């Protein structure tokens, strides 16, 4: 018996006698079966033609020892992924433009009002001496 076979049989016998914590042992426990299959699979000679290996390093046709855990999702599932980054800046940019547009419109309307009032006052002040002079001249005639 080789050293590898002795260690394999020792590991297999220790796994059979052990019971997983927190649950009862049932016949054909999947975890121990997967480990034992994995240990038994190492017995084959890697140079033999029937022992072809795949890219991942395991033999073709042998089941892997990995397990997939599935969980039921709640009815109202909110994904953890963020929305596409292209959508957010457009909305933000629109909001910013709208805000600046409102403020700019207010500034223009108030500014135009003050400019008109200022021009009217300037025109009245500018034309007042001539108006007075004209009325005085026409009165003197």
UniProtKB/Swiss-Prot annotation:
GO terms for cellular component: 9+0 non-motile cilium; membrane
Q: Where is the composition biased (Acidic residues)?
A: 30-47
Query: Which compartments does it reside in?
Result: Membrane
Q: Where are the transmembrane segments?
A: 115-137
- Report any one BP term from Gene Ontology: regulation of response to drug
Top-rank taxon of the source lineage equals Eukaryota
| Topological type in the membrane | Single-pass membrane protein
Q: Where is this region: Disordered?
A: 1-94
Q: Does the keyword Transmembrane helix apply?
A: yes
* Name of this protein: Required for drug-induced death protein 1
């Amino acid at each position: 018996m080789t050293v590898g076979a002795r260690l394999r049989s020792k590991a297999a016998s220790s796994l059979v006698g052990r019971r997983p914590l927190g649950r009862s042992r049932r016949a054909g426990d999947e975890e121990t079966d997967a480990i034992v299959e994995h240990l038994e699979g190492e017995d084959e000679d890697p140079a033999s033609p029937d022992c072809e290996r795949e890219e991942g390093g395991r033999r073709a046709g042998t089941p892997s020892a990995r397990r997939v855990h599935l969980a039921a999702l709640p009815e109202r599932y909110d994904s953890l992924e963020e929305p596409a980054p292209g959508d957010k800046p457009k909305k933000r940019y629109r909001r910013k433009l709208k805000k600046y547009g409102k403020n700019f419109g207010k500034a223009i309307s108030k500014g135009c009002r003050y400019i008109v009032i200022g021009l009217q006052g300037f025109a009245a002040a500018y034309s007042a001496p001539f108006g007075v002079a004209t009325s005085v001249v026409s009165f003197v005639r």
